[in-house]
Amino acid sequence: MTTPNLLPNAAADLARNGDANGLSALLKGGLAVDARDAKGNTLLMLASYHGRAEVVKLLLKSGATVDLRNDKGQTPLGGVAFKGYVEIANLLLDAGADPVADQGGSTPADFATLAGKTEILALLQARRDNAAKPTRWYSKLIGWVRK
């Protein structure tokens, strides 16, 4: 995949290794927050998959797109579900990550099940159930329509 904002190896290493200060300096210097490596992984994907919560917080605060997929069609939440990083899963979900995004025929819950990450599986189920609940205005609208 050819991308105009190819991620420098040094930035990818900072994300993988959890160097929030070094990465912050690069972002302030103009590094695109959604730049990708040769496999389509963003900084957010790399930091998430390697369990680097502080870097994930920095990237989300800097405007990283939470559901960008890599070349395999995977999102950061899918990788986190497989690894079992509950704190990072919460950060991604709070930032709007889709808890049921199809990733090549699998969902984050499928990855959590495969890896035996029951705490992540419960979190994804709860978030999915909460997302499916009607909002207050929707409930009022349904009540009005039924009258």
Locations of regions flagged by a protein language model:
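Intrinsically disordered, low-complexity regulatory segments in ankyrin-centric signaling systems
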Residues: 1-29, 38, 130-147
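Conserved ankyrin/ankyrin-like repeat signature
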Residues: 22, 54-55, 87-88, 119-120
